[in-house]
């Protein structure tokens, strides 16, 4: 009977509760790390484009509005200063006077003229004249700088909108990882799936074990990262993620769980971070989805429930059972102990089979007696009969 996310087998004593480990990576993929005491903040300004893209949406929109409003105000103030310096504001009623900008009678009019110039929406009755060289230079500068502001801000907003972060939200990981036998070997497994019909191209999976360790010299490393092989050597880490897949890490001699039994694993303190990467089929941009598993989320002796069924002409995926597991017979010893036991069993079988064959030969030979020459020419238990003797004349 299927059981969903059961942590222990019936009748088995639950290990003592430990203090909850602080996650390094949240289940939704957010890294639980905050940068503190960063004194060289000028480095953020050297890469202003990335800084603006990484801002929250409300701050990005605020910067977007301020960028345009400030440039309009800045150039509007300069247009007003030119008109004030040339005396245009004092000759508003003088028809013989040629101003720098026609019908510019105050700061508000200068501000509106600045907006019309930078946005190139066309002029109304405010038009620059050819009697104002400083105005012509300012017009060129505002046109060039306005184009630069447009390119920069529109580029930032486009990149921010087209970021594949939301695409990663439709890449799901199983809520638990499991440990069970696969082809006679202990394996750590978890499941990944894609909720969208458009696929992830060149998808690849990685897994890292994060736990504290102490070196031989006494150095304490609080978040040491160790790679967990999920098929890099065989190419199994490259996924064709059309339907949910179970990713397997074989616990062999190169695995950090080689000597971990069920009891030792439940008492350990670690975090397994899984990273799924690929390109979004629609945009070609790289997408990365992350999740993690703590010790309490690793179920020993469980296997994932199948979610794929064959219907009339197509395969159907039932995501209602995506996170479900069920218990299977699994030894509680470590992978090393299991391999040693299998080696001893193989050695015992290797030496016991010839001895049993010899015993069978002796029993059959004693039953036939000395007069059983007819059966002497037959093969017995894989042994060839002796060659025939020469006939006597």
Swiss-Prot record:
Cysteines paired by S-S bonds: none
Keywords tagged on the record: Ion channel, Ion transport, Membrane, Potassium, Potassium transport, Transmembrane, Transmembrane helix, Transport, Voltage-gated channel
MF-aspect GO terms: G-protein activated inward rectifier potassium channel activity; inward rectifier potassium channel activity
One of the Pfam families matching this protein, by short name: IRK
Region of interest (Disordered), residue spans: 1-23, 360-393
Role according to the record: Inward rectifier potassium channels are characterized by a greater tendency to allow potassium to flow into the cell rather than out of it. Their voltage dependence is regulated by the concentration of extracellular potassium; as external potassium is raised, the voltage range of the channel opening shifts to more positive voltages. The inward rectification is mainly due to the blockage of outward current by internal magnesium, This receptor is controlled by G proteins. Unable to produce channel activity when expressed alone. Forms a functional channel in association with KCNJ3/GIRK1.
Name this polypeptide is given: G protein-activated inward rectifier potassium channel 3
Organism: Homo sapiens (Human)
Native organism taxonomy: Eukaryota, Metazoa, Chordata, Craniata, Vertebrata
